[in-house]
Structure formats: C-alpha cells, structure tokens
Curated annotation (Swiss-Prot):
Protein's UniProt name: Putative uncharacterized protein DDB_G0293380
GO MF, one example: tRNA (guanine) methyltransferase activity
Induction: Down-regulated by Pseudomonas aeruginosa, PAO1 strain and PA14 strain infection.
Organism (species): Dictyostelium discoideum
Keywords: Coiled coil
Gene Ontology annotations of biological process type: tRNA methylation
Coiled-coil features, chain-numbered ranges: 187-217
Matches recorded under InterPro entries: RlmKL-like_Mtase, SAM-dependent_MTases_sf
Length: 561
C-alpha cells in the first residue's frame, strides 16, 4: 500500500510532523516519507517491518487522527510510461482495481491532470478511463459481490422452497434441499402454499434490495496524473460518495463570508505552537502559544472555525470524533476492509471526551450578527456549550475595552484560573474579503518574495531525515516560491487596519500578550504599525494560499523599550 496525503502547499512540514506524531501515538513503525509540493507519500509496500495486516492501521490512524490532511489517496499499482493513448490503455488493463473499488456499477468521478506530457487533453483521458471502467472494471467488481453477507436471507428462501415442493409433491420421497435449515422458521410451523409463496416473494424483494444497494453504493473517486509522460492512478480512500470531505468536521455547517476551512485553522494553530518567542536580539523563550496558559480571542470570528479547532485541541479530541454524526470513509466500502478490526480500532482511540473547557476562556467577536449566529450554531452542533466560550457582536476595540479587560480578571473560586493574558488568533479581512466586497478590485498584486520557478506538483523536494527543525526544507526552489498579496484596499479597510494597530500599540501586555493574524493584504503591515512608529512589528511565520488568495501568518513582536 502506498498512501499520498494532500495538504495546502507550504504546509507540508506541519503535516509531516503531525503524521509522525500520529503513528508514534498509534504505536506504528515509522516508514520512509517523501514530501512533495502539496502532499506526503508513505510507501508501505516494501517495508519488511510492516505486516500486511498492520498496513491498514496506517490508513485508519491518519484518516481518523489528522487535523491537517485534506485528502488521502491510495496509489493503484506502479507508475507507468504513458506517451500515447495506446500505452495508456495497455497499462490500464494491467492495474488491479478490485481492492479499492466497491461492488458498485456507478461510474466513478475522475480527475485528470497533465504536465509536460504528449498526452495533455484531460477530457480525452477521462473518457478513455470511463470506457475502460464500463467495459472491464465494472464486470470484475460486480462478480465479486460477497453473497455470504446475504446468507440468512438465502437460507430462508432455500427452506421455504423446500417446503413448497413438499406441499406441491407430497408423495415424492426424493425431494431434497433445505433439510438442515428447517430450524430457521421452525419444523412445527404450518404454512399454506399461498403463505409460503408470499414469504418467498417478500424475501426475494428484500434480497434484491440489499444486492441493489450493494451495486449502487458511491464509487471511489479516481485521480489520474500524467507528468513528463509517466502516468499514475490513485483512488480517494476517505471522501465518501455522500460528499463527506475529509477536512469537514461539522455536518451542515453554517458559514459566513470568506470562511477558513478546518484544516487550515488547525495548521495556523500548529504553526504558532511550533514557532518560538523572540526575546531581544537572537534569543528565544520557548513556544509562543500554550493553549493551557492563555485565553484566546478571535475578533473577526467568522464561522468560528479557529475557536472550534482550538477547543478540539484543548480537549485532545480526535477530528473524526468531534462531530455529532457518524463519520464514514470510502475505505470502509473496499472489498478487503475488515469491519470488525476497524470497529475495535475506533473503540481504542475514541475515548469519552468532556465538552467542558477548564482554565481557558475563548472569545469570538464580529461586527456581523450572521457570523456570531453561525459560530454559536457550529459549536453547539459539536456539543461545545460552556460559560468559558463566549461570543459578542461588536467592533474589536469596544470588545477589548468592555470584555477582554473584564474577563482577564475573572476568578470563579479558583476553578477557571482566568487571570491569564489573552492571545489573538484571527483571520483578517484583506480586501477581497468581507469589508470591500462591493468595491471595485484593482488588478495588481504586491510581491512579498522573490519570483522563482513554481515547483511542479509531485516534484520531490524533501525526504525525511528525522530532522525536526521547523521548516527545514532543503531545496532552494522551496525557499523562493512565488507569493503575492492583494494590493487593493478600501477606505474602510485602511481604517480598520489602523485602528487594529492602535489597539495593539495601546494594549497592556498583562491583558493582551500575543497577536497572530492571517493577512492577505500588502498594506496591512505598514498601516497597522503606523509605518514603523508603533511599539511593535510583524514577523512572518509562513505563507500559503487560502481559497485562491495568497496569505501570510504573522506574529506581533514588541520592540525593545
């Protein structure tokens, strides 16, 4: 088994460290990793220290425990030469799909990407795969339906047909079939011919319905990538046909303007935890964030996703278990999936979790009532209702004066220990988001890194050497990825940036200790710091893309007195 776990580009090192922690926690042997732009590949096929039965636990543990993985794909077979459609068709015939396709006649979704290859027409490639599925794969997986699952119904039918023949031919001593199965409906049960026929009809309908459901369950999604005339097929192991995407943690989630997905919210918090506090010139003081030693405030709360992920981390809840609906994955429909072992695995990792938040206050605020309502709804859906989780409608400056100072001094008989400073973690408005959605956009961007050749998807730039230094990527290409921020700004947004910077400048460090913002506007740093005149500056932790927009995670650093 070879797994490819995807993530937003530039967050690969975070995912790499998280997966290593997950595997260690699950007491699984660490395999060799390969890190690509946009994902990590784990090859379990040739590792002599990993048994065949143990391999499925890697898939189970990452899918249930990862906060960062956006999808998990299983490589189907080896990569193959693919210079023309003839080679493509021949190699499709050689691949063994049966393990990763449910017994369904529904055509799969197919995603195709091509790079620097003679085959570049993605629709033509997709059409040929669908044709191959209908002509070859569908028949193979259909005959593999495990009819033993329907054994109780089949035994009842066999028994009823035996009794029917006995009624219809009472003097035929050679009637056989069903003698050992009479106990199913009882030897003493007297049934008329009509009653038996009615029961047979009902059971046949039931059997057909069960088999029909088996044949019409959602099919695995297929990914075909052809890079420099080399093809590779993968199937999505986690996203179910019902559309339960791996990164989604809340069913029917209410969203506000420009939401951030759960995986990116977790990545932001993990990156902050992984960074270190700078004290003076060239010295550090340890982690910038300990969720147990600070209160959290998101002044642009949106849908409440950052608060939601922070709570989940505080409670040490598994991403797959911090939902009020049963999470299902596509691999549960695979032919060789062991349901019994998987259920035992889930029991071992999903321990009861208290929804109570102790010793930490979490505040979300926003000027938009829709955002407040969405946040309350989403956290309530997950069972998070506690006096330490608070939401307020209002401007951040008024919330700071009216709520943050007050909550910082609360002490509920020593139980909550709320005499702790607040840390701001927030996703700022940045031009194309929220505030100036009715303003005309300027078609220009501001570079924040030198221009360089973009790394191709799938190009290997880092191999695991057990070096846990944060972002120790050993490729000059990776250090110079092209990054641009939005350069458009409205008067309202400019005013917001200035007032936000003034609040930080005037704040008491015993009340507001740290500030982390996800920024996507090139003007934010200069405006919020008053062109360097305020008593703080911004330091970039990382950058990535959020919904097609380039963003940077910044941390506030106080200037020496």
């Amino acid at each position: 088994m070879k797994l490819f776990i995807t993530i937003t580009p530039n967050l690969e090192k975070l995912l790499h460290n998280e997966i290593k922690d997950i595997l260690r926690t699950n007491k699984l042997t660490l395999p060799k990793f390969q890190v690509f732009e946009g994902g990590i590949e784990i090859d379990l096929t040739k590792d002599p220290n990993i048994s065949e039965q143990e391999k499925e636990y890697y898939l189970w543990s990452i899918s249930n425990c990862s906060r960062l993985a956006e999808s998990i794909r299983i490589r189907v077979g080896l990569s193959f030469p693919c210079k023309n459609f003839s080679q493509f068709n021949i190699n499709l015939e050689k691949l063994d799909y049966k393990t990763y396709f449910p017994t369904s006649s529904i055509e799969p979704q197919v995603a195709v990407s091509c790079n620097a290859s003679t085959l570049y027409h993605t629709n033509a490639i997709k059409e040929r795969f669908i044709k191959h599925f209908n002509n070859s794969i569908k028949d193979k997986i259909s005959i593999d339906i495990n009819y033993s699952k329907f054994k109780p119904i089949k035994k009842l039918l066999k028994n009823l047909r035996y009794k029917l023949r006995k009624i219809q031919n009472p003097n035929d001593d050679e009637i056989i079939g069903g003698g050992d199965d009479h106990e199913i409906i009882g030897d003493d049960e007297e049934l008329s011919e009509e009653e038996i026929l009615n029961r047979i009809d009902k059971l046949q309908i039931e059997l057909e319905q069960v088999i029909g459901k088996q044949k019409n369950i959602p099919q695995s999604k297929v990914f075909i990538r052809i890079d420099q005339n080399v093809g590779q097929l993968s199937v999505d192991a986690c996203t179910s046909g019902e559309g339960q995407l791996l990164h989604k943690r809340t069913l029917n989630k209410h969203i506000s303007d420009a939401p951030i997905r759960e995986t990116l919210a977790s990545a932001i918090i993990m990156a902050i935890i992984s960074s270190t506090r700078r004290v003076g010139s060239g010295t550090t003081e340890g982690s910038y964030l300990d969720l147990n030693k600070t209160n959290i405030w998101d002044p642009f709360v949106g849908s409440g996703t950052l608060i939601q992920e922070a709570i989940s981390m505080l409670l040490k809840a598994k991403p797959s278990s911090c939902t009020n609906y049963k999470r299902s994955f596509q691999f549960e429909r695979f032919k060789n999936h062991s349901t019994e072992r998987y259920l035992k695995y889930l029991e071992s990792i999903n321990k009861p979790i208290s929804p109570l938040i102790k010793n930490t206050i979490l505040i979300g605020s926003d000027i938009d009532q829709k955002a407040i309502d969405s946040s309350i709804f989403n956290l309530s859906k997950q069972g998070y209702q506690h006096e330490n989780i608070k939401f307020f409608k209002g401007d951040f400056k008024s919330i700071y004066l009216d709520q943050i100072n007050i909550d910082n001094s609360l002490d509920d008989d020593g139980d909550n220990n709320n005499n702790k400073p607040f840390t701001i973690i927030t996703n700022l408005p940045y031009g194309t988001r929220v505030l100036n959605r009715n303003q005309p956009q300027q078609q220009q961007n501001q570079p924040i890194q030198p221009k360089a050749t973009k790394i191709k998807e799938g190009e290997n730039y880092y191999e695991d050497d057990d070096d846990d230094d944060f972002f120790s990527i050993r490729s000059p290409k990776k250090d110079n990825v092209n990054i641009y921020l939005n350069n458009s700004i409205s008067k309202d947004l400019r005013d917001l940036f200035k007032r936000f910077g003034d609040m930080i400048h005037e704040s008491n460090e015993s009340v507001l200790r740290d500030v982390f913002v996800l920024n996507g506007n090139s003007h934010f740093q200069s405006i919020s710091t008053n062109n360097g005149k305020n008593n703080f500056e911004w330091e970039r932790i990382l950058n990535f893309r959020n919904g097609g927009l380039t963003v940077e995670l910044l941390k506030m650093v106080k200037k020496p007195n």
